[in-house]
């Protein structure tokens, strides 16, 4: 099956840095890809490009304000972010930079539910989640 080949290649590309957080992130990409493919057989593999677009896209929040993931996490998810409401510092999202990201798979799902509902007004789709995490896996260097 083409999807398994694509996922296998994706896994090999990232296996050189197989830390627990990266491994969990890869597992989540695989999980969400399978769910997305089950719902839509045309969805074959995560798109890093779509993940980056999603990360930077501004949405009108349920409160009427515009926000994007990058609003708090900066344009580069390898950077330290800052909550736009509280001003609190946010550790980098990129699992290759922040080894604590994606260590708790249940927490990841809770955070997706919370943030997707806060920003989009609905849960993110499995394909959006797969694309998003695939993009985060590519960000390895904070900008200065």
Swiss-Prot record:
Description of post-translational modifications: Binds 1 heme c group covalently per subunit. The heme is low-spin in the oxidized state but switches to a high-spin form upon reduction, due to the dissociation of one of the axial histidines, His-115.
Signal peptide positions (record): 1-20
Gene Ontology terms for molecular function: electron transfer activity; heme binding; metal ion binding
Gene3D superfamilies from the UniProt entry: Cytochrome c-like domain (1.10.760.10)
Binding-site list for heme c: 69, 72-73, 115
Highest rank taxon of the organism: Bacteria
Disulfide bonds: 116-124
PROSITE patterns in alphabetical order: CYTC
Xref: InterPro entries: Cyt_c-like_dom (IPR009056), Cyt_c-like_dom_sf (IPR036909), DUF1924_SHP (IPR015170)
Assembly: Monomer.
Name this protein carries in UniProt: Cytochrome c''
Lineage: Bacteria, Pseudomonadati, Pseudomonadota, Betaproteobacteria, Nitrosomonadales
Gene designation: cycA
């Amino acid at each position: 099956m083409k999807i398994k080949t694509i996922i296998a290649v994706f896994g090999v590309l990232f296996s050189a840095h197989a830390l627990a957080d990266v491994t969990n992130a890869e597992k989540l990409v695989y999980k969400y890809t399978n769910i997305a493919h089950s719902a839509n057989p045309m969805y074959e593999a995560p798109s890093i490009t779509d993940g980056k677009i999603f990360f930077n896209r501004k949405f009108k929040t349920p409160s009427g304000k515009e926000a994007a993931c990058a609003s708090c996490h900066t344009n580069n998810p390898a950077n330290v972010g800052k909550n736009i409401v509280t001003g609190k510092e946010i550790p980098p999202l990129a699992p290759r930079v922040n080894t604590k990201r994606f260590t708790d798979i249940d927490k990841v799902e809770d955070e997706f539910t919370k943030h997707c509902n806060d920003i989009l007004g609905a849960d993110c789709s499995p394909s959006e989640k797969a694309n998003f995490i695939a993009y985060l896996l590519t960000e390895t260097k904070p900008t200065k």
